[in-house]
Amino acid sequence: GDVYKRQDLGSFGLGCLQKDMENRMRKIITSLIAILVVTNLEAQQRTPKLVVCITVDQLRGDYIEYFYNTFGERGFKRLMNEGLVYNNIRFEFSDIDQASAFATLFTGSNPCFSGIAGDKTFDFEKEKEVSILNDPEYLGNYTKENYSPKNLFSSTIGDELKIASQGRSDVYSIAPDAESAILSAGHAANGAFWMDNTNGKWATTTYYKGIPWYVDRYNNGPESLASRLETMVWTPTLPMEKYDAFPYVLDDLPFRYTFSEKFANCYPNLKTSPFINKEINRLALQFLEYGGFGTRSCPDMLSITYYAGNYRGTMSKEYTREIQDTYYQLDQDIEKLLDTIDKKVGLANTLVVFTGSGYYKSEESYPDGLMVNGGEFHPKRCLALLNMYLMAIYGQHTSWVQGYYNNQIYLNRKAIEDAKLDLTTLQNKAAEFIQEFSGVQLVTTGRSLLTGDWNEGTAKFRQGTHHLRRGDLIIELQPGWKVNLDNPKEKVKIIRNNAVITPLVFMGNGLKPQHIYREVKATEVAPTVTHVLRIRPPNATQSLPLWELKIGN
């Protein structure tokens, strides 16, 4: 019996020992899992030291696909293979252009809130077109133009970063044009730089305080664009047989474009060639070399704009070798930029945001003899007939129509007020009259958009205009129709409502490669970036962050 008891107690002691070891092992494994999870989360969710926003004006996702076999491994392909890729972003308004697109991307709000509905606006008192950012209160540095972000009514990503860091973060932007440079920088940025159209120097506005010494040196030194201009010739980079993405190219001769200050529009033309992207890179590399990005206690931000549209803005034909060469060279420029970021700051410490502007200028004329549905809409004739119609109703003592600009008709508000007429009634009568014109698809009134009387068809007009600059009538023409301004200096515009595929890529900062085929809104970009930075979104943001980049996912 004693033996049995001793054996039983021994078995009991052994069982206790096994259980104790199991408990200890369980605790060790649990601790290891917790450490691994925390380490993984920290790797994925740390705040980046640098944010680089790369926006390509007129980027087309389908062109990236068409020209893919000509690209190297570390440009477009690196973005697509190593990034979190969204197949397409969508802008919620029509008539997208450079200014409205950039304002939307960097504020997270459509023009109805940001105030930026287009590159230009029309000053009817002075009877001239001016930049939406024109501001005579500020002088230009290295330019005679006057700009400021005063007409941008929303804060930007950079503004919120400056506020959160109490000014310690550096925020800069570089772009071909003033509109994209200033709108991607914002109100509180350290600086915004663009290429001046008359001297080719990197210009800015006195709204921003100070110019980095290396920008001054670049503008005035032996590396300046003016000192190299005569040697810059754009010819095919690849053998001619490599430009095989389009079967519609009929011209077998290689193209050749030169740039000289002797010719008018020298610098504007260069800004629509692949050389502008190389010049952008030259300056961006100066910032990365001397700007101390990623070394401060708070994150820094650098916004870069490339160009991927047609040469001279529009070409007389589409499917050209020029556009294929533009993308081929842009691929090399992206590769050089990413490699430099990796070397100077580290892509693991950098959030790269890559996307496009959501539109593409296409003004190809139809071949002779080819009939396509459509006609010509003449705004001047339309205004004259509308004024005669309103005179017949309200009297001939004044002109009731002020002007036309960018698919909008502006009535003479002062005359209407002096006559004590009801603006809503007059707008409605004018809209009913214009709706009868050939080629007019839809007309809506500014008053109806202001008071909330819109539907799915007219909501895009509300999103794409701001009430302070909105016309009394907004006109949408049928596809295929031409807008003829009866001005020999202005090109006839062909109405095309093509959707443009615009990819969105987030890369670096511990993000894992992934392809998302869900369409996202352009207003989701800014709040996503600020979420990764752990700061407030811009103050007019209309969307939430993309959930794939939310902290904790």
Segments (PLM) and residue ranges:
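Sec-dependent N-terminal signal peptides
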Residues: I28-V37
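His/Asp/Glu-rich, glycine-adjacent segments
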Residues: N110, G115-C298, Y307-T314, S438, ...
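Non-catalytic, well-ordered alpha-helical segments in soluble enzyme domains
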Residues: K77, S154-I163, N406-V443, N509-G510, ...
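Beta-strand elements within well-structured catalytic alpha/beta cores of enzymes
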Residues: P48-R60, L79, L105, L161, ...
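Short, structured active-site-proximal loop/turn typified by the sulfatase FGly-forming signature C/S-X-P-X-R
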Residues: I64-F113, D170-I174
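Secreted, luminal/periplasmic, and some membrane-associated catalytic domains
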Residues: N87, D97, K120-K144, A185-H187, ...
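Short, small-residue-biased leader/transition segments that mark boundaries at the very start
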Residues: G1-Y4, A43
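Low-complexity, glycine/alanine/valine/leucine- and proline-rich hydrophobic stretches
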Residues: W481-H515
